[in-house]
Structure formats: C-alpha cells, structure tokens
UniProtKB/Swiss-Prot annotation:
This is Propanediol uptake facilitator PduF. Keywords: Cell inner membrane, Cell membrane, Membrane, Repeat, Transmembrane, Transmembrane helix, Transport. GO terms for cellular component: plasma membrane. A motif (NPA 2) lies at residues 201-203. It is found in: Cell inner membrane. GO terms for biological process: glycerol transmembrane transport. InterPro entries: Aquaporin-like, MIP, MIP/Aquaporin, MIP_CS. One of its GO terms (molecular function) is glycerol channel activity. The chain crosses the membrane at residues 10-30, 42-62, 84-104, 143-163, 179-199, 228-248. A motif (NPA 1) lies at residues 66-68. Its main location: membrane. Belongs to the MIP/aquaporin (TC 1.A.8) family. Induction: By propanediol aerobically and anaerobically, under control of PocR, Arc and Crp. Has 2 promoters.
Amino acid sequence: MNDSLKAQCGAEFLGTGLFLFFGIGCLSALKVAGASLGLWEICIIWGLGISLAVYLTAGISGGHLNPAVTIALWLFACFPKQKVLPYIIAQFAGAFGGALLAYVLYSSLFTEFETAHHMVRGSVESLQLASIFSTYPAAALNVWQAALVEVVITSILMGMIMALTDDGNGIPKGPLAPLLIGILVAVIGASTGPLTGFAMNPARDFGPKLFTWLAGWGNMAMSGGREIPYFIVPIVAPVIGACAGAAIYRYFIGKNLPCNRCEL
C-alpha cells in the first residue's frame, strides 16, 4: 500500500468514526442521559455529522465513508478497483472506533441505566440500548420488508449523491455538496427512520454491531431477536440499493449530460 492510499484510508477511518461518534453520542444522550430530542433533531445531528465528516475527508479520500458508496462508485463511476477493499476495511474500522469512543464517554450512564431498569445485556429488552449503536427494524416489519426499505432508501441516497457531486448536472455544487448530502440523509431519516433506523451503510451498522457483540450484548446484537440474523440486512441491502441508485442515475440522467464519462 503506497503512502497516498494509506492517507486516503486514514481519512476514511477518521471520517467514518467521526460521524458515528456524533450519531451514537446523540442517541446515547437521548436514551441514557434523558435528553429531549425529537426525530427531526436526531436526523439533523446524523446528517450534519456526515456533512462535517465529508468536509474533513473529501480532499483526501473523496469522503465515501460508506462501503456501499465505494462499491457503487467503483462499478459506475470509475473509482479504482485496487482501492475498494482498503477503503472498506478502513470504513468498518472507523465505525467500530466511533462506537467505542462514544461508549467510553457514556459508559457510566449505560451502567446506571441498566441497574435502574434491571436490564441484562443480551436479553431482548437490552436491544433498547443496543439500538443506540446500530439499527434494528420496527417490530411490525419482517426481515424482507426491512431489506426492501434499505434497498429503496440507499438507492435514493446514492442517486442523489451522484447528482449532487456531478458538476455537469445543473449548477456546480462545489463546497455545498457535503452539506446537501447531510441534509439528504436527514430528510431520508425523518421520512423512513422509524422503519429500519436508516442504516444505508454497511460499516455504519456492522462496525457498531460488532462492538456491542463484544461489549456484552452477544448474539442478540447480531440477530436482533429475529430468526434470520438481522445483521445481514444492513450489509447486503445497502450495497444492492447503492448499485441500483448509481445505475439509474448513470443510465437515465448521466449519459444524457454534455460531459465526458468513463465507459463501463
């Protein structure tokens, strides 16, 4: 791995960890510290966290911060194949690190909450706290319905990311693109968050899930109490959705724009 790629992976690690730290910190404040936050406020914090992370990293790595985005850009926007796996590893590691850091700062409040509510980690009831770190679907949704939600919202996310970063599509977005992407995430979260927690990012979900598995929630963290282990859904569905969104943008919008594009 050359020095340039190391720097890019380092940026992906830091950026992914940063927005996870903000998002998990927000949910920790809500659930174990008694903060008063509504759905829109939570979504805005997640969205602005992503915007700030992209601003931090875009000049070095492009600010992917999401394996689904990296894979879609490789398949549909000429991102170099040799960078895909290192980026993804850095993103998963960053997500784990962001979850760990947020937990360290709030650990005493987690312990106090569990003691006060007689909550045992690894029980179904403990998913209430595990959901601070990663996503689980609403009880009324089965695994396949949750997967469909994640495919749809990630396809919207990816299609809009390509539109917002494509200077050939209307007015150049330039420095506004990260902010607009953050607003996009907040809007998606506000409209569909109660269904699945709007993961849209395998690293954002599995990195913290791995942390909770190690931190005492065990298999319950991975399965979500479902017969089909739920951790699979936020890994696979966002990749499918991102590729679908990129393909739709590429073939219905991008190919009709007056600019040069790489050939598949």
